[in-house]
Curated annotation (Swiss-Prot):
Gene Ontology CC terms, in alphabetical order: collagen trimer; endocytic vesicle membrane; low-density lipoprotein particle; membrane; plasma membrane
Residue ranges annotated for the Collagen-like domain, each copy included: 273-341
Keywords of the record: Coiled coil, Collagen, Disulfide bond, Endocytosis, Glycoprotein, LDL, Membrane, Phosphoprotein, Receptor, Signal-anchor, Transmembrane, Transmembrane helix
Positions of post-translational Phosphoserine modification: 27
Organism this protein belongs to: Homo sapiens
Protein name according to UniProt: Macrophage scavenger receptor types I and II
Connected disease: Prostate cancer: A malignancy originating in tissues of the prostate. Most prostate cancers are adenocarcinomas that develop in the acini of the prostatic ducts. Other rare histopathologic types of prostate cancer that occur in approximately 5% of patients include small cell carcinoma, mucinous carcinoma, prostatic ductal carcinoma, transitional cell carcinoma, squamous cell carcinoma, basal cell carcinoma, adenoid cystic carcinoma (basaloid), signet-ring cell carcinoma and neuroendocrine carcinoma. Barrett esophagus: A condition characterized by a metaplastic change in which normal esophageal squamous epithelium is replaced by a columnar and intestinal-type epithelium. Patients with Barrett esophagus have an increased risk of esophageal adenocarcinoma. The main cause of Barrett esophagus is gastroesophageal reflux. The retrograde movement of acid and bile salts from the stomach into the esophagus causes prolonged injury to the esophageal epithelium and induces chronic esophagitis, which in turn is believed to trigger the pathologic changes.
Cytoplasmic topological domain residue ranges: 1-50
Glycosylated residue positions: 82, 102, 143, 184, 221, 249, 267
Length: 451
């Protein structure tokens, strides 16, 4: 019995060594969830994912099948060795059992029963091994299918969330593109409006500049005419004062002669006879001429102070008065800093060339170290007055155009100079630009100043 138990344990050990791993592809594909019907793109992605998963399974099977074959061969070799050992042990037992009585029938029956029992035990062991392998395979594949199903569901959930987020981002991008298109259209409209507004503003500014230039010309002309009228008024006032003085002298002489004649008439005495009878009243004669104005009577007493009248309009600006007497010399100032030692004599930037004297000639101006002429466009009295005043003359007598004092040889520096007549030099007037090519030296301007 001990040998029987030892043989039975060895048989169980040899059967337990023959274990193998089997994979069922149909069960795996059956456990996969159906295709989701979200959108064509998602279905295509899922199909591609399925194909990749199947390819991965095939690759795993292609790698594992040779390994399983090699392991099975090794196991078969080891199993055959164990089986040969167990068979030798069994033969030894049978020989030991049958050695006592080869001719007895009980031994034959025992051998037959033993063989049947051994075959039944082998069938049961094989059935148990098959059941164990199937159970292990089903549990392994169930766990694997559950994990793969869970992972696949997670992947589907992630894909659905990703697809929803992509759709949300796509909708946001569409809205942003629409807003950008509307913003672009509004910007284009705004740009067109700005361009139209700029064009209108430029037209209005150009018109206003033309109107301002016309008004400036009118103001210049009016100011020149006013200055000329003021000068004429001064001359007329001086002439009228002289005439009034002459008339006063004449009236005084006439009054003196009249008084002398009246005195001589009073001294003449005539012999008169007796008065005759009064004659008839004659007709009224014509009104005689008014007599000479009598001498002014004595100044009467001052009257009462009247009420203060309303403030009158401001009068015109009077002529500049004569220079006053020089004041007393002030206190001595502080000692200044030492200079560089170079003394520069002041020089004028305007000169008159080609005239009969220094007070008249062609006007030339110094610019950039070179003397040049001035074109006679808009050359008027007020510009000549500024030129004469800058040269130290009291006023202008006449302005000349068309190279009256001859043509110059240098560059033509200025053209269309605008002055009010109150500037101290021609550089303070309105100058468009230095250097012009729109004129020639046949249009050089000149001036004659008053002495």
């Amino acid at each position: 019995m001990e040998q029987w138990d030892h043989f039975h344990n060895q048989q169980e050990d040899t059967d337990s060594c023959s274990e193998s791993v089997k994979f069922d592809a149909r069960s795996m594909t059956a456990l996969l969830p159906p295709n989701p019907k979200n959108s064509p793109s998602l279905q295509e992605k899922l199909k591609s994912f399925k194909a990749a998963l199947i390819a991965l399974y095939l690759l795993v099977f292609a790698v594992l099948i040779p390994l399983i074959g090699i392991v099975a061969a090794q196991l078969l070799k080891w199993e055959t060795k164990n089986c040969s050992v167990s068979s030798t042990n069994a033969n030894d037992i049978t020989q030991s059992l049958t050695g006592k009585g080869n001719d007895s029938e009980e031994e034959m029956r025992f051998q037959e029963v033993f063989m049947e029992h051994m075959s039944n035990m082998e069938k049961r062991i094989q059935h148990i091994l098959d059941m164990e392998a199937n159970l292990m395979d089903t549990e392994h594949f169930q766990n694997f299918s559950m994990t793969t199903d869970q992972r696949f569901n997670d992947i589907l959930l992630q894909l659905s969330t990703l697809f929803s987020s992509v759709q949300g981002h796509g909708n946001a991008i569409d809205e942003i593109s629409k807003s950008l298109i509307s913003l672009n259209t509004t910007l284009l409209d705004l740009q067109l409006n700005i361009e139209n507004l700029n064009g209108k503003i430029q037209e209005n500014t150009f018109k206003q500049q033309e109107e301002i230039s016309k008004l400036e010309e009118r103001v210049y002309n009016v100011s020149a005419e006013i200055m000329a009228m003021k000068e004429e008024q001064v001359h007329l006032e001086q002439e009228i004062k002289g005439e009034v003085k002459v008339l006063n002298n004449i009236t005084n002489d006439l009054r003196l002669k009249d008084w002398e004649h009246s005195q001589t008439l009073r001294n003449i005495t005539l012999i008169q006879g007796p008065p005759g009878p009064p004659g008839e009243k004659g007709d009224r004669g014509p009104t005689g001429e008014s007599g000479p104005r009598g001498f002014p009577g004595p100044i009467g007493p001052p009257g009462l102070k009247g009420d203060r009248g309303a403030i009158g309009f401001p009068g015109s600006r009077g002529l500049p008065g004569y220079a006053g007497r020089p004041g007393n010399s002030g206190p001595k100032g502080q000692k200044g800093e030492k200079g560089s030692g170079n003394t520069l004599t002041p020089f004028t930037k305007v000169r008159l060339v080609g005239g009969s004297g220094p007070h008249e000639g062609r006007v030339e101006i110094l610019h950039s170290g070179q003397w040049g002429t001035i074109c006679d466009d808009r050359w008027e009295v007020r510009v000549g007055q500024v030129v004469c005043r800058s040269l130290g003359y009291p006023g202008v007598q006449a302005v000349h155009k068309a190279a009256h004092f001859g043509q110059g040889t240098g560059p033509i520096w200025l053209n269309e100079v605008f002055c009010f007549g109150r500037e101290s030099s021609i550089e303070e007037c309105k100058i468009r630009q230095w250097g012009t090519r729109a004129c020639s030296h046949s249009e050089d301007a000149g001036v004659t100043c008053t002495l």
